[in-house]
Regions:
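Glycine-rich phosphate/diphosphate-binding loop of Rossmann-like nucleotide-binding domains
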Residues: 1-64
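Adenosine-phosphate binding glycine-rich loop
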Residues: 84-183
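Rossmann-like adenosine-cofactor binding region
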Residues: 37-105, 110-112
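Alpha-helical scaffold segments in soluble metabolic enzymes
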Residues: 1-8, 51, 55-58, 71, ...
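Short glycine/serine/threonine-rich phosphate/pyrophosphate-binding segments
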Residues: 1-5, 26-28, 66-71, 90-93, ...
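Ser/Thr-centered flexible coil motifs
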Residues: 32-34, 69, 139, 159
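Surface-exposed beta-strand edges and their flanking turn/coil or helix-capping segments
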Residues: 31, 74, 119-122
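Intrinsic disorder and flexible coil segments
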Residues: 10-11, 23, 50, 55-57, ...
């Protein structure tokens, strides 16, 4: 779903290399393939996650804990974006990323780290919008609108009542605050 959404937002087909438990999903691979994986297969010499991460701008992880190493992160392009969203433990921790990359933007699915990626940020509002317009399905345009609204909200000043819910944290747009916190109205 994530890759389909970013492709709907304009990422070219060849701009994403997907991996599963057997490695890179590439044109010509036979092991473990199905119609959904085949739809995202690309022409590449990369065969492993480590290969795919060399020079990558972005990593979206939705797999298992500790599947990304510091060496993989170090091999990425400048200013990499790393969304390690496996729960309860991410593919790589923010501490491990910061140890090798001070320029990285990092997000996880955990509330005890900055930039928590959590469906609580989108579901109530997407459903409210769908109900308001009597939509029978939630389409890409709705998902894109929600993503853009969250991005805009993260750039706004954080209200005092939200700051009070997060004592001691600096909540302002930057590497450690690209996603609003759940209590932001």
């Amino acid at each position: 779903a994530c890759v389909e959404l970013i492709k709907a937002m304009g990422l070219p087909h060849e701009g994403a290399i997907l991996c599963d438990s057997k490695g890179v999903i590439y044109n010509g691979r036979e092991a473990g393939m199905n119609q959904w994986k085949s739809a995202h297969a690309v022409d590449t010499d990369a065969r492993s996650l480590a290969d795919a991460m060399v020079g990558a701008d972005v990593f979206f992880g939705l797999s298992v804990a500790d599947s990304v190493t510091q060496d993989m992160v170090a091999s990425m392009a400048d200013n990499p974006i790393i969304f390690a969203m496996a729960n309860p433990d991410p593919e790589i921790t923010p501490e491990d990323v910061k140890a090798v990359r001070q320029d990285a933007i990092m997000a996880t699915g955990r509330s005890d780290y900055p930039n928590q990626v959590n469906n609580v940020l989108g579901f109530p509002y997407i459903f409210r919008g769908a109900l308001d317009v009597r939509a029978s399905t939630i389409n890409d345009e709705m998902k894109i609108a929600a993503a853009r609204a969250l991005a805009e909200l993260a750039r706004e000043d954080v209200p005092d009542e939200v700051l009070a819910a997060y004592p001691g944290e600096r909540l302002h747009y930057g590497r450690d605050y690209i996603i609003p916190v759940p209590f932001d109205p």
